[in-house]
Structures are given as C-alpha cells and as structure tokens.
Amino acid sequence: MGAARIAPSLALLLCCPVLSSAYALVDADDVFTKEEQIFLLHRAQAQCDKLLKEVLHTAANIMESDKGWTPASTSGKPRKEKASGKFYPESKENKDVPTGSRRRGRPCLPEWDNIVCWPLGAPGEVVAVPCPDYIYDFNHKGHAYRRCDRNGSWEVVPGHNRTWANYSECLKFMTNETREREVFDRLGMIYTVGYSMSLASLTVAVLILAYFRRLHCTRNYIHMHMFLSFMLRAASIFVKDAVLYSGFTLDEAERLTEEELHIIAQVPPPPAAAAVGYAGCRVAVTFFLYFLATNYYWILVEGLYLHSLIFMAFFSEKKYLWGFTIFGWGLPAVFVAVWVGVRATLANTGCWDLSSGHKKWIIQVPILASVVLNFILFINIIRVLATKLRETNAGRCDTRQQYRKLLRSTLVLVPLFGVHYTVFMALPYTEVSGTLWQIQMHYEMLFNSFQGFFVAIIYCFCNGEVQAEIRKSWSRWTLALDFKRKARSGSSSYSYGPMVSHTSVTNVGPRAGLSLPLSPRLPPATTNGHSQLPGHAKPGAPATETETLPVTMAVPKDDGFLNGSCSGLDEEASGSARPPPLLQEEWETVM
C-alpha cells in the first residue's frame, strides 16, 4: 500500500462524470431572452402553416369520400403516419362520449393557436400533444389537451369566445410550488457576492504581482494572465446581466400564463432594420463568451505550464511564455469570431443567445476539450506526486502522513485545474425541482463564482514570497515614516525591529558650528545609519539578485509552487536550458 495507489482511484472517480455529460458545463451561464422566444414561436408557426396546407388537403379528400373519419388508436402516444410522413398525435379517449358516436364523423380541423400546432382531431375524443420544446420554460415531459366534440368542432370555453385547451402539465415548472422565490433569491445573492469578491481580490492580487519587481517571473506572469481572465469573466457577466435584465427572466416565467403566451406569440417578428437595437446585447453576449473561453484556456495554460515543469528537463520558460500568451488569448478569439460570423449570416436574430440550434457547439467543443485535457493533466500530476511522495519519504514517515501530504497537494491544485466542475456534470439542467437540484445549483453557483477568489487566496495572498515582499515593503515604509517624524521633532532616533539607534543634535557642541546634516553628501555611515541593517534598500532602487536577507522565513516544502522563489526560475532570452540540478530543486519545492 502506498500513496501512489490513490491516483488510479481518483481518476476512476472523477473521469466518469467528465466524459458522460461535460456539455452541461457551458450551458449553466446561458441566457434565453424574450426576443429569442418570439423568434422560435414564429418559426414554429411557419412550420405549422406549411403542415396545415398538406393536412387540410388530405382532410378534404377524406371528407369528399364516403369513408368518414376513424382514429387509428387511442393509446395517447405519437405515431408516424406512413402515408404523408408527418407526425399526428393520437387522441385520448373521452369516456363521457358514447362509443358509437366516436367511430365515424367529421374530424376537427387542424390549426395553430399561437402556441401549439394542433393536428386533426377525431370527433368525441380528447387530443393530446406533447408540450412544445420551443417554449423554453415548459415542462417538456407533459402534454397539452383539447377536446373535439361530436360535430367536428373544437370545444370552446363556456361564456368565452375562445377554444378550450389545458396546458396545466406544460406550466408546472412556472408555478410557485416548484420555483420557490426564496431559492432563486438565495442563488442570486451567492452569484453576486461570489463574483464581486472574486473581482475585488483578483484586482488586489494583480496589483501586488505587478508592483513588486522581485515577483516578476514566468510563473507569476502566467498567474497574472489567469487572474485577469477571471476578472474579465466576472465583469462581463455583470455587464451581460445588466444588458439582458429585461429579457425572459425567472420572475416573468413565474407569472406567465397561457393568455400571456398567446400575446407574446402574436407580436410580429422584428424587421431587419430593428436588428440595430440588438447591437448592445449582441456585443455583451459576444464579449461574455470570449472572456468565458479565455478563462478556461488560461486555466489550461496553468496546467500545461506546471505539467511542463515536472515532465520536461529542459524547459525555456521565457520562450514558451509568448506561446502561452497567444494560446490563452488568441485561440478563443478564433472560434468566437467563427461563431459570430455564423450567427450573423445564418441566425442573425435576437441577442445571439447560445441556445439557438447546434451553432453553440462552435464555442462549446473547444471549451469542453480544454476542460477534459486539463483534467487529464491533473490526474497525471497527482499520479507523479503520489509516486514522488512514496519514493522520497520511504522509511521516514508513515502512510497516513503521505496521504495527508498528497491530499494537501491535491486540494491546492483543485481550484487551479477547475476539477470542481466535474462533481455534478452528469446531472441534467432540465430538472428544476427537488432537493438534489437545489444542492447542485448551490454548489455550482458557490464554486463557479468564488473560484477566482480561491485562486487569488491560494496563489497570491498565501504565497510565502509575496508575503515576504509585503513585509519588507511595510518595514521600509514604517522605518522611513519613523525617521521623518523624529527628524521633524529634532531627533534622528529610529528603530528597526529590536535594534534602536539614537543621534541627538544636543550631542554636537555649540562651538562646533554644526547642525544635524541630512545631505547625502556625507558618508553613508553618517547620513543613513540604517543602510547596513538587514534587508535595507534605498527607496525606489531596483532589487538586485544578490540582495538577501540574513534571516529567512521557514517555508514548508510541500506547499508546491506557492512559495517558490522567482530567482533562478527564468532563463535568459537566448533560451538556455535549465541545468538538471535546478530542476531537482524545483521538484523538491513542489513536494
């Protein structure tokens, strides 16, 4: 038994949901607007009008003959009519009508009621059709019902001049019983707080890494690019929500009734000239998709970089940094531009939402490929970590300690590789009810929105090198502030940790004619008595590679790349390879 045996079990546990239904990963952020719904309704109406012409022609031939109308069966399930090649939902038997009156008679003519294309109805029977899938928030497993009376007319609502229809099964997802308002309010709060905290923490992290010159190295450059992608993703989500807030929201869906669906369906489709009004939401959706894709690809770049450091003995970091930059920002721009071109030419309607046909795969396939590839890299790195732990700690620690080290390293890598995406990916997004659905949505909203915050905490604020630079900068600032305050009060007393130095102007005789000189023309020992103290550097002067602190911080070795120094990691522009001993030191830092 060894720590290396955890890796195969972990791979088997996490790989299945990734390969089974990874496609649901991107659809979680999809937005369905009212304009898109109107477009789908009018497209369904056009298809129904074409079908009605053929069916009415067939019905006229039937009524001209003396054969009457006899339904094929009463099973209530759709079947395919061989004669015309069209689908005709079969009728459900109405037990209130005598059997003899249902055998022959004039059928109810098919028609479009602004929601469903109703087929021919057998006299005296209830016609059931599946809830249309082009109504986004319908329960697509239910049915809508109409009744055809014995005279061959659709039954009307008593006292109203409209046809009776029952859409209760289709509307069950829109009731307050299944879509509880407090659940969605809580999810919205998690969503907003998470992305806000991620945006704020990532902004601070980028400023820290950019400010300190000693933190400038390839590893931190890649971190900064990934942080920036998280920031742009969060900002684009807020902008997209603000632009599309007037769309087909959950509040509207809860209040939606059959009559309102008829009103929506009767709105004429917008003319081509009105497409200019969609420019704002289309730009918002396009930038959201681009920054979403770049975020996934910079997560993949982090995985590729770490994988290359471990498995490549000669790895030119500066040389590959440009390639990583083009890969992370340029490749998503290519397939997003292709998607924009396809939408603009083939489906230039509404706000260019992803849910329009199979065109969404132009963006989803590259993103899902990056997720699967990053997951494979994660499993391989965990496998190597387990092997190295078993080899380096053989005979020095027990198995439980090895497991704890492996678990700690794994948890550090989880937010970097986005492994949390795989937990609920096998569950469909259509089941908008139940305890399991609520657990899934709370989990995904929490980790998706807070992922940037976790990454900033682990890879910047908990980085020992970053903490050391902040302490040095704080000590220099407080020392300079204390020196200025003492100088204004007539004393040059200052302190540096436990060390105290004091030079007073009263120690100089009045006959000497001297005052406390603060000019840099004096020797360093006189003008700046603390210049030889540990860690001192002139304000504004760049740090040198030879500058070291006499007292170093104890950094745990198994914190991985969190506390690795930037010194010595980057190579010269000539692309000289790192010697094998340095690679071994880097590997020991990982462990």
Swiss-Prot record:
GO cellular component: apical plasma membrane; basolateral plasma membrane; brush border membrane; plasma membrane; receptor complex
Motif (Important for interaction with G proteins): 474-477
Alphabetized SUPFAM superfamilies for the sequence: Family A G protein-coupled receptor-like (SSF81321), Hormone receptor domain (SSF111418)
Matching InterPro entries: GPCR_2, GPCR_2-like_7TM, GPCR_2_extracell_dom_sf, GPCR_2_extracellular_dom, GPCR_2_parathyroid_rcpt, GPCR_2_secretin-like, GPCR_2_secretin-like_CS
Cystine residue pairs: C48-C117, C108-C148, C131-C170
Subcellular location as annotated: Cell membrane
UniProt xrefs under PROSITE patterns: G_PROTEIN_RECEP_F2_1, G_PROTEIN_RECEP_F2_2, G_PROTEIN_RECEP_F2_3, G_PROTEIN_RECEP_F2_4
Keyword Zinc-finger: no
Cytoplasmic topological segments: 213-219, 307-320, 383-409, 464-591
GO biological process, alphabetically ordered: adenylate cyclase-activating G protein-coupled receptor signaling pathway; adenylate cyclase-modulating G protein-coupled receptor signaling pathway; bone mineralization; bone resorption; cell maturation; cell population proliferation; cell surface receptor signaling pathway; chondrocyte differentiation
Gene Ontology MF term list: G protein-coupled peptide receptor activity; parathyroid hormone receptor activity; peptide hormone binding; protein homodimerization activity
One Pfam family hit: 7tm_2
Post-translation changes: N-glycosylated.
Signal sequence annotation: 1-26
Topological relation to the membrane, as annotated: Multi-pass membrane protein
Membrane spanning residue stretches: 189-212, 220-239, 283-306, 321-342, 362-382, 410-428, 441-463
UniProt keywords, alphabetically: Cell membrane, Disulfide bond, G-protein coupled receptor, Glycoprotein, Membrane, Receptor, Signal, Transducer, Transmembrane, Transmembrane helix
Region (Disordered): 67-104, 516-544
Ranges facing Extracellular side: 27-188, 240-282, 343-361, 429-440
Biased composition (Basic and acidic residues): 81-96
Recorded family membership: Belongs to the G-protein coupled receptor 2 family.
Entry function: G-protein-coupled receptor for parathyroid hormone (PTH) and for parathyroid hormone-related peptide (PTHLH). Ligand binding causes a conformation change that triggers signaling via guanine nucleotide-binding proteins (G proteins) and modulates the activity of downstream effectors, such as adenylate cyclase (cAMP). PTH1R is coupled to G(s) G alpha proteins and mediates activation of adenylate cyclase activity. PTHLH dissociates from PTH1R more rapidly than PTH; as consequence, the cAMP response induced by PTHLH decays faster than the response induced by PTH.
Subunit structure: Homodimer in the absence of bound ligand. Peptide hormone binding leads to dissociation of the homodimer.
Name of the protein in question: Parathyroid hormone/parathyroid hormone-related peptide receptor
Organism: Rattus norvegicus
Lineage: Eukaryota, Metazoa, Chordata, Craniata, Vertebrata
Gene that specifies this protein: Pth1r
